[in-house]
Amino acid sequence: MTSTVPFVSNGVANGNGNGSLNPQISARIRERLREAGASFLANDNIADHLQPGELDQLQVEVADKVRDLLRSLVIDIDNDHNTHETAERVAKMYLQEVFKGRYHQQPKVASFPNVKQLDEIYTVGPITVRSACSHHLVPIMGNCWIGIKPGARVIGLSKFTRVADWVFSRPHIQEEAVMILADEIEKLCEPQGLGIIIKAQHYCMKWRG
């Protein structure tokens, strides 16, 4: 027997009477990225390709998927008060907090002419950085030190912290995170010299044993 009632799971019925579904918001975003030839690897920022309201829709979809994951882990989320709202919490955590560097624009950073013609090396740090291993999605926690030999332009010291937080708030391996952070700093202030040191604990090693 063929059902005439559209089945909706994470999709939205389009209301045209034929029971077909609109594609999930993640599928629409992926299609847009592919059409633009844009990379969407784990540590890429895709904010330029998100339309207004889509991040909220994506958060709802992610919560649905996390709910499915918990059920597949045989966790009774309907009767366990500790996990009843876990899916919503995890979705918000990923999109708005720990992976915000993928979905949100870079913090605004103003640069200024180096009118004093400073050319001495200075350092900023330790800066607390938090990320996640892109292999297992478990935390990477540590500190970052940035050494700069100024060029024609300079930025405020607090801006290094904001940019580092934005870059590290994505799934990463540490080596790539350092390269991305260096590229962003070079674009912002074009230093004569730049050095970055990261000292971090990787919980894919500590937690998993």
Where are these regions (language model features)?
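A domain-level signal for the structural core that forms small-molecule/cofactor-binding pockets
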Residues: 2-209
